[in-house]
Structure formats: C-alpha cells, structure tokens
Amino acid sequence: MNVGSILNDEPSPSKKTTNDDSGDSVRPDMSTYQRHSLVNLLNDPAPNNELKTKETKKDWSEDEHSNFRVPVTEPNQQLSPVLRRSSIADITNEKDVDISSSTEHPIEQDKSEKDEDELTRISKLKSTNKPRRYTEPPIWAQEWIPTSYQGTANGTPVVNAQESSLSSKRVFDRSSTVNVDLECSITGVIPPPSVTRTIAEWIYANFTEIPDDQRKYVELELKFGTIIDKRAGHRIDINVSTECIFTDNSNTYFDMGVHEVGWNDMCKFLDDLEKSYQDELRRSPQANSNSPKRKFNILESDITDNFYQITSRNEQPKSIRISKDNLLDPPRYTAINKQRLSSLFIHNPSSMYDLRLSLSYENPIADNNIDGIIKKNQPTLTRIKKRNSWTHRPTVTRFDMTRVLSPRESKNKSGKKIVEQDQSFEVELEVDTLELFNGFDKFKSGADSIRFEELVEIFVNNARCLNNRVTKLANK
C-alpha cells in the first residue's frame, strides 16, 4: 500500500475484490479533483459547484486522443474554466495561462494607470536625487568675465558671420613624435610654450572686452624695437637669457624701429623665400599643381600720413590720421581714428630686437569730413611711408617692411628755414583678426579648444623667424 492509496482511502490489499487473475476489473470513476498523488496536493480544493455539476451531466463522450472522458454539455451551457496546477510549470505560471488551450486570461489591473504610476515615481526620483552635473559651475570653475561685461549676455559667443577660409586641420601635432621608440612626454601631450600661452591669455582677456560690432575695426600687430630703461637710457637688463613677458611698463618705453642693415636683411630673407618657392614650382609642376602661384602676395605703397589733434566740446581729444595715397592721380585720402587699447612687451635678450604686441581700434572717418579737418587744423606730425607688404595667407600674417621719412624743419646760419628728412626703418607684423576672432569664438563655444592658441603661436613664430635671421647676421 503506497502513500497515494492512503490519501485516496483505498482498502488494503486483503479487502480487494476477487477476479485479480482476470485483470479486467474496472475501478469506479474518479473525480478529476481526486488526489491521486503528491503532485495533486498542490492543486486548489475542488469547488462545491463544480462537484454538483458532475451530477447533472447527461452524456459522456470519450476523447479519441486520451483516456480522459470529456463531458458533453448542452449547446447553450457554458462551463467556467478550471485551472489545474498539476506541475511545477503550472505553479510558476504567473499569467494564469490555461496550458490545455493556451489562452491567457485578462489581467484586471489597468496598464495605463500602472504606467502613469511608474512615470510619477521616476519623476519623483529624478527630482530628489542629486544631479550628475552642476547646472551652474562652482565659482572656482566659472569663466572669468570682465567687470564691464558682467550682467550682460556675453556668456554665449556670437560666431562671426564670415566663416574662416582656412581648414580646421591641426598645425602642431602635440601628441606624437617621429621616432616610434620615443614619447613626447609622460602624459602623451606636449605642454604649450609658457610665453605663447601667456600671450594667448592676454589676447583672450582683451577680446572679451570688444563688442561684436567693433570686431571689424580691431588691429593686432607686432612691432620690432627695443625696450628702453628710462633711468639708464639703454636697453633693459633684467638678468634673464630667454624670451619672456616684461610687465614693468612704468619705468620703460618701447623704442620702435630697426637698423637699416637688419631691415635690408629681413627684406632679402622674404625675397629668398619667394624665390625658393618659385624654384620648387618649376622643378615639380605636377606635384604642386594645386599650390598657389606665389608664396606671398606682395604690395608696394607710398603713403603720406598727417596726424591731427582734434578737440571738441565735452569730448576727449582725438588723434586723427589722414593718409594720402601718392601712387594715385588724383591722390586718394582716407582717415581713421586710432585708439590703442593695450600693449604687451616681449623681451628677448638673446635676439637683436624686442617685440611689442599692440591691440588698437581703427575707426574710419567719413570721407565728407576729411576736407574740413585738413582746412581747419594743422598737422602735428607728418610721416612718408614707403612700404612693401608681404601677405602670407597660410600663416594669417602680413609683413609690413616700411622705410619712413619724417620731415624736420630747421634754420641755417642765415636764418633760412631748411626741411630735412629723417629716415627710419620699421618692421610690423599684422595678424588676420577675422581668423583670430573665429578661433576665439570656437574656444568659447567649446567647438575647438586649440585653434585660438594655435593661431597665436603661428603669428608669434613668424616674428621669431625674422628676429632669428637678423640676430645671426649680427653675430657674424
């Protein structure tokens, strides 16, 4: 006698009926809810109404695919489905799917309400949790804004309407070296030169003060000369041997100009670069078919500048420069009001000359006001400039090599007035401010954090090339 027989209240083997040897004895029909084994113990107890239904059944038909008997009901009679859990699979049936018919009963819970509850819970979690990033950077991480621009909408840069004509390809590869067995640094990045970084920061700080509508009038130029100590009367000596930024402007001044020998040698240096470029084009025309025909765009000019000091009521005095183009007949007059914004001295004791980086406004004067200024005022200074300009587009630089004649009046022994011409030589490098402002905007917007400093380094490198050239000449 097994456990199933005990649970089903079967009689002991001694109480069984005879005819065992025939094997044809039939047991009475058992309800589908009788517990035949331990597995059936897992099933729910049979409802009373289902047991009563069995008594009202009329006909039975035998299923052709199984030994179970399927009850046949009346056409209009419907039986409630009975879910049986006869296996572990049925027990873990979370959706209450009838295995025999594979039908799924609808879930009473409204899914839309459940989704809304989930969204509400997620929104609450987002509002209570700490954000991953600051909506506003802490004070130590915020960008410095000048006092004049605080409280304005200058935080978002306005990109210049005129796009750059240069590509965004990197000029200086600061992450690799030529030799495969060497690395540029322990971090894999070459640190920027300290002098170049300081110059770029100085330009950046001044550019933030310039309104967008005034950008087209900005001029940024490097001039060759020497930093003179006012007390000693000669070039400064601050016990340094390399290039540096000199900030003590109170006791010094910048003596602009170069020697004639050095000026001629720098002009020859630019001419030699142009000749070498032309020779390279002739040697390999096919390889350089897409290259420009000239390395530099060279322009000669002959300009006479007259400076006027204009004073108006309730206004500060203005220095007006009226330029006369002597190469045109009749000559053409243009006038500007030049205002210097800031200057930076770059001292290099190992080179022949120092540099002064000047940032200025060049506001144009209307042509109809020029005649009135000339007739009503006397010039305070006259300069005749015979200039050769080399414009090198790939380095966004224009080289101005100028021979300046300054008329000087004097009297001879007999008292007769004599006009003499003092001659001087000047070297200026002017950067394309449009390209520099484009790099400035890209840096502020985060689109390109390298372009701005890269342009500054290119510009300063051009000045270093000329300075090194004339220094070699002096050391011979």
From Swiss-Prot:
Bias type Basic residues, positions: 123-132
Gene Ontology, cellular component aspect: mRNA capping enzyme complex
Similarity comment: family membership: Belongs to the fungal TPase family.
Keyword Nucleus: yes
Residue stretches of biased makeup (Basic and acidic residues): 51-67, 105-114
Single GO molecular function: mRNA 5'-triphosphate monophosphatase activity
Name under which the protein is recorded: mRNA-capping enzyme subunit beta
Main EC class the enzyme belongs to: hydrolase
Keywords: Hydrolase, mRNA capping, mRNA processing, Nucleus
EC number(s) on file: 3.6.1.74
Catalytic reaction list: a 5'-end triphospho-ribonucleoside in mRNA + H2O = a 5'-end diphospho-ribonucleoside in mRNA + phosphate + H(+)
Gene name, Swiss-Prot/TrEMBL: CET1
